[in-house]
Amino acid sequence: LCADESCQDRADLAQCVGRYQAINIKLDKAGGLTEALALAAAARDAGLEIMVGCMLSTSLGVAPAFLAAQGARWVDLDGPLLLARDRDPAIRFEKGTMYPPPSALWG
């Protein structure tokens, strides 16, 4: 069982321990990359698995989540794939693999 809206940042983490086996971290909910990384570390320390997801966004919005996804058990960063047109340059997806953002997208 994975907490999604029940765990937005570290303030919500204590109520999830014992109720869930995992949390879904989204940068939009956490307030940015710094809190998302801190939440992931705290969740691991509490024995919870990590999923990193995203809202509908361009590649620029998903690029920092690529960092938070390192070490996550599940990753769902398909937001740019749901757009009719993404920005250029865009994150490259091939056969289910997401490649690191190009430096021109997110230094």
Describe each region flagged by the PLM.
Residues 4, 9-12, 28, 45, ...:
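Acidic-enriched, low-complexity/disordered segments with a strong bias for Aspartate over Glutamate
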Residues 1, 17-24, 42-49, 69-75:
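Glycine-enriched alpha-helix->loop->beta-strand junction motifs that scaffold or abut catalytic
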Residues 55-107:
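Flexible C-terminal active-site loop/helix
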Residues 1-9, 21-32, 53:
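Catalytic beta/alpha-barrel core
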Residues 16-18, 38-40, 66-67, 90-91:
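Short, glycine/charged-enriched secondary-structure capping and boundary segments
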Residues 10-12, 31-42, 61:
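Active-site-adjacent beta->alpha loops and helix N-cap segments on the catalytic face
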